[in-house]
Amino acid sequence: MASPARAPVLALKDVRLADGAKPLFDGVDLALEPRVRACLVGRNGAGKSTLLKILAGQGVEADSGERAVQPGAKVVYVSQEPEITGETLLDYATAGGAQDYEAQAALADFGLDPDKSAKGLSGGETRRAALARAFAEQPDVLLLDEPTNHLDIFAIQTLEDELAASKCAALIVSHDRAFLNRVTERCFWLEHRKIRRLDKGFSEFEAWAESIMAADAEEARRLDKVLERENAWLARGVQGRRARNEGRRRALLALRAEKKDRQSELRGTMTMAVESAGTSGKRVVEAKGVTKRFGERTIVENFSTRILRGDRVALVGPNGAGKTTLVKLLLGELERDAGTVQLGTNLEVSYIDQARMALSDKITVWDFLTPGGGDSIIVRGHPKHVAGYAKEFLFTDAQLRQPVTSLSGGERNRLLLARALANPTNLMVLDEPTNDLDMDTLDLLEDLLADFDGTLILVSHDRDFIDRLASSTIALDGKGGVVETPGGWTDLMDQNPDFFKASKGGTAFAPVSKAATKPAPAAPAAPKKSAKLSYKDQRRLEECEALIAKSPAIIAKLEEALADPNLYTRDPATFDKTMKALDKARADLEQAEMEWLELEEKKENLAG
């Protein structure tokens, strides 16, 4: 016998809201039962944050519809930009009604000192403080708007653990796929101003959404055919204007309005492209024995790496570990205490920075895109009107003359992308590029970077983003320890599962047990260096494996061409060229097989 349906703890019914003449919600229904953890997904500008505010009963009121909260239920909302008040973090965390001991435990879970001043916090500290306060209040419903922004990977994992342990229902807006995959069991899709519901976690969402979009596209094609037929009917003359055909004419006008609505949504699709600035040298960056300290704190010690043309290198580590510092060291923008850094030839660097430092609040969007003045921007070598280019990044004409201060976090990020992508580049550096981006823009950015034929250095906390893009990952533990492994975040953790364990006690984020009443013990000694191949050897091993796999087909094709008895007499130049290519392919295969055997033997010896 099926279990009875539970009454929702928070619900919306037939909610409608318009932004001026533009409808935002048109009959939205949403119900959240106790202890259900769900995500709210939707494209840029769909109104996800607005809907959370309506659910929270804070700041936005619907034009019509109902909001129902279970009697006695406590709803807590954490916005994208929480404001921290009070003298200390404990003052802030108890302001919502939590007891001191509850607030202290929650702050400790997120690695925060209750006595720390509430002023001058970093973005990550602000976010952790807001989350700690929310959990300390023990809500029945938790509404989270982009909760992983500015958090490092370890703080995100703590948030995942807190959600799993909590008895509250939760509705989450986030672009972080790995996070949503781990914490959600239901998806609400805000699309076409209504809500569609999937009673499965986010891991099932994208396949489900694609099937719905395919069905919608087929329905749109059917409606277009009907509209074409009805337009022809109306064009035949006055018959279409007679009273007895008024119903048919109204239906035609409704079809036209629906098509116009669909077209306006399609126009809200962002486009991106990037052009290489020409080929850089094969060696992009070579660092040897690099050491950097700030006072007594070591960022990196005796670190060496080589970044080659086409590499996609991710940098990960706790907030404050020195990832941005290492980027500046590798680019030669910061003096080293020891070691050398050599940059390759013909480098054109494009840098999108974490703190959005390139954006001045005093200028407008137009001014930022045209630093030299005028009404045109040079895009990949050709002039383009700034208004047209801005529209490709979803900026309206009205926004062009607005100050940067009026932009949301996601809009600021898009503005930086717009300017950076206008210039040809062969070395792109992105420092936390996924903050504030919606999933559609994030997908587009991933596609762009995957097709980019230059070199990429990426600082990110987004595990899924790293796994999809990175060819290698450099991890910093915050105490000078650095490890580099092929692949993304998952590969890093598979190969170095204990790397960060010894470091947490000394980094900016150090979670503490709720039961802890004494200071945390000193961190254990850093683990011994893993007995594995060096990064260079591992990279060469993989290159050899790839060459061994593809060479037989190449050799067979060349041998087939040479089997033509008339090739030499018909085209001696092609015969010679093919023969040389065959000799080279055979020699390369033999060399790769020899190196592979040597490296595999070395790997076995290291493993003991």
From Swiss-Prot:
GO MF annotation list: ATP binding; ATP hydrolysis activity; DNA binding; ribosome binding
Which parts of the sequence belong to the ABC transporter domain? Answer: 7-217, 285-512
| Matches recorded under PROSITE patterns | ABC_TRANSPORTER_1, ABC_TRANSPORTER_2
Q: Supply the Pfam families for this chain.
A: ABC_tran, ABC_tran_CTD
- Gene3D superfamilies cross-referenced by the UniProt entry: P-loop containing nucleotide triphosphate hydrolases (3.40.50.300), Valyl-tRNA synthetase, C-terminal domain (1.10.287.380)
Q: Which key words tag this protein in UniProt? A: ATP-binding, Cytoplasm, DNA damage, DNA repair, DNA-binding, Hydrolase, Nucleotide-binding, Repeat
Q: What EC number(s) is this enzyme filed under? A: 3.6.1.-
Segment C-terminal domain (CTD), binds DNA: which positions? 522-608
Query: Which GO BP terms apply?
Result: DNA repair
Q: Which residues bind ATP 1?
A: 42-49
Top enzyme class of this protein? hydrolase
Per UniProt, ATP 2 binds at: 317-324
Listed InterPro entries: AAA+_ATPase, ABC_tran_C, ABC_transporter-like_ATP-bd, ABC_transporter-like_CS, ABCF_ATPase, P-loop_NTPase, Uup, Val-tRNA_synth_C_sf
Q: Which CDD domains match?
A: ABCF_EF-3
Does the record bear ATP-binding in its keywords?
yes
Q: Where in the cell is it found?
A: Cytoplasm
**Which Gene Ontology cellular component annotation is one that this UniProt entry carries?**
cytoplasm
Q: Which residues form the signal peptide?
A: none
Q: Which reactions are catalysed by this chain? A: ATP + H2O = ADP + phosphate + H(+)
Principal cellular location given in the protein's record: cytoplasm
Q: Which family does it belong to?
A: Belongs to the ABC transporter superfamily. ABCF family. Uup subfamily.
Q: What does this protein do?
A: Probably plays a role in ribosome assembly or function. May be involved in resolution of branched DNA intermediates that result from template switching in postreplication gaps. Binds DNA and has ATPase activity.
Show the domain comment: The C-terminal domain (CTD) helps bind DNA.
PANTHER family reported in the protein's UniProt record: ABC TRANSPORTER ATP-BINDING SUBUNIT, ABC TRANSPORTER DOMAIN-CONTAINING PROTEIN
Instruction: Report the protein name in the record.
Output: ATP-binding protein Uup
Gene, per the UniProt record: uup
